[in-house]
Swiss-Prot record:
GO terms for biological process: translation. InterPro entries: Ribosomal_eS17, Ribosomal_eS17_CS, Ribosomal_eS17_sf. The keyword Phosphoprotein does not apply. The gene is rps17e. Belongs to the eukaryotic ribosomal protein eS17 family. Keywords: Ribonucleoprotein, Ribosomal protein. The lineage of its organism: Archaea, Methanobacteriati, Methanobacteriota, Archaeoglobi, Archaeoglobales. This is Small ribosomal subunit protein eS17. It comes from Archaeoglobus fulgidus (strain ATCC 49558 / DSM 4304 / JCM 9628 / NBRC 100126 / VC-16). GO terms for cellular component: cytosol; ribonucleoprotein complex; ribosome.
Length: 65
């Protein structure tokens, strides 16, 4: 089993998906770039975790586009 994502990662990702549902795709690298542009997150690790969580939600169809 994998680890559970921290709540702050989920909150940031859900807010981004709520504001920009049509922007994000199932491509991690593209989402990583978008998260960097749309937020002021300085930490590379946090940025990647947010992008990964968004990618997972999009690929699983948990986003209302």
């Amino acid at each position: 089993m994998g680890t559970v994502k921290p709540a702050y990662i989920k909150v940031i990702a859900r807010e981004l998906l709520k504001k920009y549902p049509e922007v994000f795709t199932g491509n991690f690298d593209e989402n990583k770039r978008l998260v960097a542009e749309l937020t002021n997150i300085q930490s590379k690790t946090v940025r990647n975790r947010v992008a990964g969580y968004i990618t997972r939600r999009v690929n699983r169809g948990l986003v209302n586009v």
